[in-house]
Regions:
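Surface-exposed binding patches on compact interaction domains or structured appendages
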Residues: 1, 46, 57-63, 101, ...
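Solvent-exposed, conformationally flexible loop/turn segments
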Residues: 1, 111-117, 155-159, 174
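Short coil/turn segments at secondary-structure boundaries
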Residues: 2, 18-19, 150, 178
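Long, low-complexity ectodomains and other extracytoplasmic segments of secretory-pathway proteins
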Residues: 7-130
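A short beta-strand micro-motif common to beta-rich folds, especially ectodomain repeats
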Residues: 2-10, 122, 164, 168-179
Length: 179
């Protein structure tokens, strides 16, 4: 408690002041983040904002009161340059998040007697929220993919439609196999 004294030509006035300082955690668009569980909820709903917090100097406050090994894990995973993958590995390393796994809708496709170039789509499913990045490579010069690098941001929900072309002009005659 304190008093502010105001002196003027009209007299002297005293204004009592009471200040209370509390630590409400780190404020984000989703509310206060003051522990690892709150951070994980933020990451699940807004990975980018969670990443900004993860790369800030304030992040160590989130780990106060948590397992002491988490701070060591964080320091190891936050060396520059820090990427989304580092944050993902940190979350998995705490045991509080499952790793993202991927599954194809089908593993084989057969085409017979193509008269023209064909465009098709292969659905790719991810198991849970979180960051993933993959590079797509094809075997067979008659196959082309529209996108060679796919990240978790490309998924709609848990599904990504991998579009590919089978180029008729590059098939030639006989059987052709690609991957």
């Amino acid at each position: 408690d304190a008093v502010i004294t105001i002196n003027s030509n009209l007299g002297e006035y005293q204004v009592p002041v009471h200040a209370e300082i509390t630590d409400d955690g780190i404020q984000t668009s989703r509310g206060a983040v003051d522990n690892l569980e709150a951070f994980i909820k933020l990451a699940e709903s807004d990975y980018r904002e969670a990443f900004r917090l993860y790369t800030s100097e304030s992040f160590l406050k989130v780990l106060q009161g948590e397992d002491p090994g988490y701070e060591s894990l964080y320091r190891g995973m936050s060396r520059n340059p820090v990427t989304y993958q580092h944050m993902e590995e940190f979350l998995i390393g705490t045991g509080k998040k499952e790793p993202v796994t991927l599954r194809l809708e089908k593993t084989e496709q057969t085409w017979d007697h193509l008269d023209t170039t064909v465009k098709d789509c292969l659905n790719l499913y991810k198991s849970t929220w979180g960051y993933t990045r993959m590079e797509v490579e094809v075997t067979g010069d008659f196959l082309e993919v529209e996108k060679k690098v796919i990240t978790s941001e490309d998924f709609i929900g848990s599904v990504y439609g991998l579009e590919y072309l089978i180029r008729k002009e590059k098939l030639g005659s006989g059987r052709k196999y690609g991957q």
